[in-house]
Amino acid sequence: MAGSAQPAAVHWRLWLAQVGVFAGLALLLLITLIGAASPGAGLPCFYAAIVNYNARNLSADGGAWAQRELGARHPALFLETPTTAAFSAYTAVVLLAVAAFDVAAAIIIRRENSGGFAAAYHMNALATLATPPGALLLGALAAWTLQAAVLLLSHKIMVLAAATYLAHLAPPAAFVGLFCTAGLPGAEYAQAVHALRERSPRAHRLLGPGRAVMINLAGGLLALIIGTAPLMLGQLLGAGLGLSLAQTVVAGVTVFCLAAVLFLVLTELVLSRYTQVLPGPAFGTLVAASCIAVASHDYFHQLRGVVRTQAPRAAARVKLALAGVALLAVAMLVLRLVRACLHHRRKGSAFYGHVSAARQQAARYIARARSSRGMAPLEGDAAALLDRGVASDDEEAVYEAHAPPRPPTIPLRRPEVPHSRASHPRPPPRSPPPAHVK
């Protein structure tokens, strides 16, 4: 038995080593971003200042053709400087959050399991459920490739930086997919998390609701990377292949729209099996589409003469496509929240209990506010929330996952007494007052 426990212990220590390396690379990425944004750090330029729409000849720096016969070039469409810096910082923060999550998981797993082959095997299973070793490797690779792209952008080596960022797209996509699924089918994942409820409540809180939060953060991260990578493709096409300005814009926006729609569909079909409350991917897609729309509006305003010459209808089509992606993201966000509430309502889970409690508190607050102002009580559907169960502060519904339904309570009533003369006897007659004695 001791010989069987030794490989499990080796696997556990290797996972701990991977967590340490991953946390170190995530921290190094954050330090690199801070240094690349500091003027006195030694880097020549600010990495997030990728494009400049001033009227000047950029033939030496690269860019898209504006007037090929005159040698005039202009930069391709890209995000604004604060947006680029914010997206990169969010990537570093999410990777650091995953590293902190893994450290907390390692501490909890170690405290609640000690000695024996079964304990060692259970520790490895929980470690894989927290973050698979392959996901740690992909996350470290994502941090390293983004760091390389930031350094190249600081030196304004645009073609190589764009190619590096496009290569950076693959590791985060694989990392998010493997981290969210934990390498398990949806049914097995739900069963593994549910089994921790009785065996290890502390691990269940971390690997259940806590991991659901991390899945939302990771989904939002991938949405932002999907919004940045197509614009990097436009930079590569404009500077490396010498395409026109309109061609680079149309190519970048088209790739983003297709990738965003595919990502939203896969999120609803695949990732929703692992956590029902999943607004992160749709919200991240909405943010990415909005940021690209703001950047494209400024871009078309600054270079309106060139855009009208090359493609008069390009601006309207780009804005229409981005608006469609944003509306689709909003629709998918609402759909996911509605389906999540219906799912938890059907299961009678704790999440639906919290939602119902919040709704009841809001209804009580509205009722008190209206009564303090002397307003009439609500009618119709709004008044349905203000029933006895809502107005009572002492009653609190408790919802547990897969809990059996409660039997209906029958109110106790006092037995009715028939109204009759016997039940209500007449009072005794009053005695006459004593006579006065003279």
From Swiss-Prot:
Transmembrane regions listed in the UniProt entry: 14-34, 89-109, 133-153, 159-179, 213-233, 249-269, 277-297, 318-338
One Pfam family it belongs to: Herpes_glycop
Keywords annotated in UniProt: Disulfide bond, Glycoprotein, Host endosome, Host Golgi apparatus, Host membrane, Host nucleus, Membrane, Transmembrane, Transmembrane helix, Viral envelope protein, Virion
InterPro entries: Herpes_glycop_M (IPR000785)
UniProt subcellular location: Virion membrane; Host Golgi apparatus, Host trans-Golgi network; Host endosome membrane; Host nucleus inner membrane
Domain of life according to the entry: Viruses
PTM per Swiss-Prot/TrEMBL: N-glycosylated. It is not O-glycosylated.
Topological category with respect to the lipid bilayer: Multi-pass membrane protein
Region (Disordered), start-end ranges: 395-438
Protein name listed in UniProt: Envelope glycoprotein M
Virion surface compartment spans: 35-88, 154-158, 234-248, 298-317
Organism: Bovine herpesvirus 1.1 (strain Cooper)
Family under the similarity heading: Belongs to the herpesviridae glycoprotein M family.
Compositional bias (Pro residues): 425-438
Function statement: Envelope glycoprotein important for virion assembly and egress. Plays a role in the correct incorporation of gH-gL into virion membrane. Directs the glycoprotein N (gN) to the host trans-Golgi network.
Gene responsible for this protein: gM
GO cellular component: host cell endosome membrane; host cell Golgi apparatus; host cell membrane; host cell nuclear inner membrane; membrane; viral envelope; virion component; virion membrane
Assembly and binders: Interacts (via N-terminus) with gN (via N-terminus). The gM-gN heterodimer forms the gCII complex.
Topology Intravirion: residue spans: 1-13, 110-132, 180-212, 270-276, 339-438
